[in-house]
Amino acid sequence: MSYSLHYFIRKTSTRYQLTQLAGNAGLHADISWVYLMEDIENTDFLRGGELVITTGMSIHSEQTLLAFAASLKRKQACGLLLNVGHYITKIPLSLISYCDENSLPLFTMPWKIHIADLMEQYCN
């Protein structure tokens, strides 16, 4: 059973301290899976509909982050959630603009929140 991204975010945003930064027009999409992706070259493994979470461990520039978001959009991911505070400390305005212009929902979650807890909640 899949849920809309809007429903999932509404049910989990307080518990996991999620903040939406962009892409409101894409919230109607269904989530097929919550996918942790650290190797940004592996977007070919996506099937579509994934809410992709990353810590940004392999993202070392604004251009790389933008290219990652564009690749997620091409692969029809339903959203991007950045686990911020360790590898990613600042969200570029260019990323926020890109996600808004392309209806790709963009969220942040503090580093102190365990990614596995969010993934488990979706699975249950």
Which role does the model predict for each range below?
Residues M1-N124:
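Alpha-helical/coil-rich non-catalytic "connector" segments in signaling and regulatory proteins
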